[in-house]
């Protein structure tokens, strides 16, 4: 019965994603999927994300070897977005990641520069068993973003700030290089949101063998993180799905000014 439920659900997902892709032209188009472990035949949670584009956005898998960045090394993200900067707290963990197949000879297709940063990193798993699925672009309410603007290059210039917020494509690199558990990865990302903010809103999964967390931020520094249970399903096509939550629940972490 569980297998039948999942097959029907995945069939619906494929039809929905195909319909959504058919109406999408040159836009951020992704669909995030979560199926709790109780609804999966193998008994483990199912986390996925489709990119609803044509074949020119096929993916290439890579491995970032352990120690690529040493403790104290300075990371500079893609100049196209600011860029975000980070000093590694320890030698980086080994992790897998994938990028678009338009990444040639070390040239980043986003900024056109030959740089050390990874181009549009979306998903990966590190040697500690931590997985991150990111780049589910969201859109914040204009009234909210006026009160808590995105910490992008324009904001940094207007506020004379030397740092900008994290861009969604840098999230997998930083979390997978640094975090030894899902909980540690969640704390790190939320600390970054609080201290540096974000360039744009997004939805992010951070999980390991024990926990699956889903984080949404729809303005510069505000966020909600929820530890997902095993009896739920959700499908998210570039839209925030977290609604009313109990901020006192031990499975919910929210920014203090939310």
Place the predicted regions along the sequence by residue.
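Sec-dependent N-terminal signal peptides
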Residues: 7-18
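C-terminal segment of classical bacterial N-terminal signal peptides
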Residues: 19-27
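Short, well-ordered beta-strand elements within core beta-sheets of diverse protein domains
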Residues: 172-178
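Short, charged, surface-exposed loops that flank catalytic or proteolytic processing sites
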Residues: 178-184
């Amino acid at each position: 019965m569980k297998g039948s439920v999942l097959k029907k659900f995945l069939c619906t997902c494929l039809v929905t994603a195909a319909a959504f892709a058919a109406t999408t032209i040159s836009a951020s188009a992704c669909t995030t999927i979560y199926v709790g472990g109780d609804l999966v035949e193998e008994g483990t949670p199912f986390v996925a994300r489709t990119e609803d584009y044509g074949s020119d956005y096929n993916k290439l898998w890579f491995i970032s070897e352990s120690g690529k960045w040493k403790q104290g090394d300075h990371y500079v993200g893609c100049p196209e977005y600011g860029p975000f900067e980070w000093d590694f707290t320890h030698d980086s963990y080994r992790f897998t990641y994938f990028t678009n197949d338009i990444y040639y000879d070390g040239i980043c297709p986003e900024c056109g520069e030959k740089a050390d940063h990874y181009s549009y990193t979306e998903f990966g798993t590190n040697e500690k068993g931590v997985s991150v699925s990111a780049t589910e672009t969201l859109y914040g309410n204009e009234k909210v973003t006026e009160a808590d603007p995105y910490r992008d290059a324009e904001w940094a210039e207007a506020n004379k700030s030397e740092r900008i917020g994290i861009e969604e494509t840098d999230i997998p690199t930083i979390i997978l290089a640094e975090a030894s558990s899902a909980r540690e990865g969640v704390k790190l990302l939320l600390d970054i949101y609080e201290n540096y903010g974000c360039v744009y809103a997004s939805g992010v999964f951070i999980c390991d063998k024990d926990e699956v967390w889903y984080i949404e931020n729809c303005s510069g520094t505000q966020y909600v993180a929820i530890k997902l249970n095993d009896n739920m399903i959700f499908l998210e096509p570039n839209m925030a799905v977290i609604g009313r939550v109990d901020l006192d629940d031990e499975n919910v972490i929210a920014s203090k000014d939310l």
